[in-house]
Amino acid sequence: MTIQVLFATEYDSANIVISLLCGVEVDHDLYPILYKRINYNNGASNNDGSRSGAINFDDRVNDEDSRLNAPVDDTIEFCLQTQSCEDSIRIRPVFYCHAHALNFETRYRTHEVLGSATLLQCLDESRTLTMYRRILSEIITEPSSASEKRNPAPTNLRHLVYFHRDVLVKYLTENFIMPTSPAWFISVFGSYEASLVLTMHYYLLERQYSTVQTTQHYAKCFTGDMGKPLVSCYSMKDFMIMIQSSAFLGKTAKFTHYCKLKNDRDLQELMAIDASINAFRQNVCLTEAEHVHFMYLAFGTALAKTKFLDYTLKTSLLSNNDDQTNNCNDYIVDNCAVDNHCQNDIDEIIIPRSSTNRTFAISEVSYDRSNSTSSSGVYSMDSCDESRGSEDSAMCSLYESRYLSHNLKKELLNIMELYFTPTSYLNIYVKVHKHESKSPLFEGYSIDTCSEKGTVFSGTSTSMADRLRKGNKMFEGLFEETDSEGVSSVLNIIASNRHAILPRCEDDDSCGKSTSGMPNRICKREIVFPGLTRPAPMYRTDGFNNMQICRYFSVVSKENWFSNSNLTDVLNMVPDEYVSDERLTESVWVPDVKVSSPRLSEQLYRSRHEMFNDRLPVYNFVGDVDLKVTGPVSKDWMFSFCRTLRRIILETFEHLFEKIDHGEHPVYFFKSGCEPENGSFCACSEKIGLRVITPFPRNTCILGGKTMKHLCEIINHILFLDKEMFSLVNVTVVDKNCFDYGIYSHGKSVRLPMMSKVDENLGFLQNRLLPLFIVPDSYRHGGRHKVFVRDQLNISNWLHHNASGTAYDPCKTISYVLSIDDVGRAQDVSFIDHKLNKLLKKEYVHIDTIIELFKSKYDISETRYFIEKIVWPQFLRTIKTNYHSAAGNQFNNVCFDDTSWPCVQLFKIHQGTRRNFSCIQHDHRDGRENVQFFLDFRPESATTIWTTLWSRCFSRKCKSNAKNVHVSHKLTIQQ
């Protein structure tokens, strides 16, 4: 039998121990704090060693503490706390004494301090000498001097310690914690008697993985009586007597058993929480940001304060502690001999007898919903005997139900499952607001794509502004003056249906004509663009002149599309028989053009972008898809992705709008061209660009770009929730938000199919959007696939605001979709962030609300003026301080375009015109002014906003149009 004794001194323990080992009596005493009996040869010394809360040390003969070959007679190990915790050993011996000579337990009960003379009489020099020889052999590897090599190692303990005193003092100081005041013990282990005694005993004398904080928590769960406070305990002797006389020493064996069971219970809960969270994560595709936020949300919900306190009470012994105090009132220090009566009491409280021997596998914690019959979280289990007492049944259900993980599923994961399941998401969270009308209330484009004579109005942004100014002067007084700056004003005029009535001249005999020959009713659109009686698309064309990109804007109402775009021969080469989508795509060969044309009439059919008009109804869904992939994809993968995407879009439209014939409804796909090598299908290794276009169901159109953005966000959310799509893209696609909803802002443009990008350096055409045919079932027979190919190559089917000939059924009412809302979101906050804000009790404040507070504080009415006077000066100072003068000077005279608020674009004013900037990060070879700068506004709280300055440079050195963030500033309203 061995007794481990934790002692302390009021002086430097290292020097006291070394002096004792040298045989020198010192004036300082040793204060035994705690002790424990250990039988190194008993293989059943730790009956609970197999539990995860403790370490299984059944074979202590092979343990490091038994390195001196378990003694024949009883031995006392005088130990100190180690600096490091290796293999969960927190105390190690510094010397040994003979137990029969010291009679330690009698001295402990009488609160006797141990003087140096007493210890010298009982010192076990043999075992102590063996221990320090081993220590010195590890510290001193080889003899350094010739004299050390000649002289043999001392065989006497006193000689050994004397000749290596400095080395051993340093060793003890570096490897052991040697407090000299009770204040250290009180600050670390607790300021109350129960916390200190129970925590010290379990943490220092039991080999387990729990930290001090965890053990203190267990002590609070173990007893409600924390004993007396220790603030008046100053001397080490008083501290020793307090511990030795504490009634809580009689509960250490019971507390040890409770801690191991509680530790195992906590571990099972955490494993169940992990399994539930991982099971959910493996079945949904989240972005990186959503993954991080979901982890915070899940663990914050599972371990919320109220739930954790409730769980703590359910697994504590507070209600049973007082009844069982007298059962274990003897101080039992041998953990191997825990009284069976005490152990059974704890088993009945923490784990019922019927559950004690059960093995709980992780597979029990799956993501299947648990049927709860109680709102408290303790729900019945079939394995519990109904005839058992209410307390036993509750504890049985508590242990088997995994209380915390059950509440996690109940309060979050089951709700998340509804939101991340396509059908339930569309049924519960998506609300569509429609207006039904028997007759058309709005009109879209009216274009003719087969006209031999074209109607095209083209020019630069400057010439378009001149048109507006001339129109304002020409009929001043008939219409309100239109802002002549920006292409958005041109779009507003194109969409306007407001007419003015011209006064009739009395001398005019002609019917319906004025003297000027103008009609009596005239629209402002016809003034600016003569002959344009109905809305028409406005395109942006990128040209290349004088080694730089030039942008032109064209309003086209009539053109011969197939002839001018050289697609007539393509249609003639379509095979007569349909074989497969892959074969049809390969057989339709489109002639390639690599160089920009200096003539706008030709360049219009090589580079064309449609500009979104927020004032016109939307008849076609035009999706701009950017697939961020891990590497090149195969042909089979690409076509499988398109077919699955087609099905998901049609199912979504069918649920939101009207019934759709999946075998008839067209969905057009166009993929950005690349140059594959070695016969591969695609060479895109980082990003695949797609254009997905499909008309809305008949008699359905959407009003407003905001509604289109919401629809795009819904499709983004649903897309990767589909099981077939998820298995297809889980490894291949990096980011799930592949649909760009920024193209649905007023004045934003999207590149049309069959069009190319213009290289900014040499003007070459690249990444042309080429057709990829996914033919509906009804078009696959009787040569109808030719009709589908012609429709897919017809520009009239690609435009946002152009209704097809079959868009309306006169026998049915027309549905104008006014809004499509995801009620699971809070304004601009995602579903997960909304839940996280509620968990953190963080109230979301819209940016417009905060801006109004700032404007009222500074007595400013216009947002642009607020940006110019309050926000921008901070950025200007930062730019001038951190960038070279040439870069900073171009920001001296700027203006702001808040059309896409809260993203504000900057322009510099040069000779009365708005222009972009030069790059401030690098000195590019051409140094052109084509860099766009923006200010992003984001709310942090009800009184704070963050503003970020970022830019997009088109050069490769700046990552080709990637977002480059420069600086952020914080603006706060002082309360």
From Swiss-Prot:
Zinc finger feature spans (CHC2-type): 919-958
Keywords tagged on the record: ATP-binding, DNA replication, Helicase, Host nucleus, Hydrolase, Metal-binding, Nucleotide-binding, Transferase, Zinc, Zinc-finger
Name of the molecule in the record: DNA primase
Record field: transmembrane: none
EC number: 2.7.7.-
Subcellular location: Host nucleus
GO cellular component: host cell nucleus
GO terms of biological process kind: bidirectional double-stranded viral DNA replication; DNA replication
Classification via InterPro entries: HSV_PRIM
Pfam family of the protein (one): Herpes_UL52
Major location category of this protein: host cell
Family: Belongs to the herpesviridae DNA primase family.
Site for Essential for primase activity, residues: D624, D626
Function description: Essential component of the helicase/primase complex. Unwinds the DNA at the replication forks and generates single-stranded DNA for both leading and lagging strand synthesis. The primase initiates primer synthesis and thereby produces large amount of short RNA primers on the lagging strand that the polymerase elongates using dNTPs.
Superkingdom of origin organism: Viruses
UniProt key word Nucleus: no
Oligomer status and interactors: Associates with the helicase and the primase-associated factor to form the helicase-primase factor.
Keyword Zinc-finger: yes
GO molecular function: ATP binding; DNA-directed RNA polymerase activity; helicase activity; hydrolase activity; zinc ion binding
Native source organism of the sequence: Elephantid herpesvirus 1 (isolate Asian elephant/Berlin/Kiba/1998)
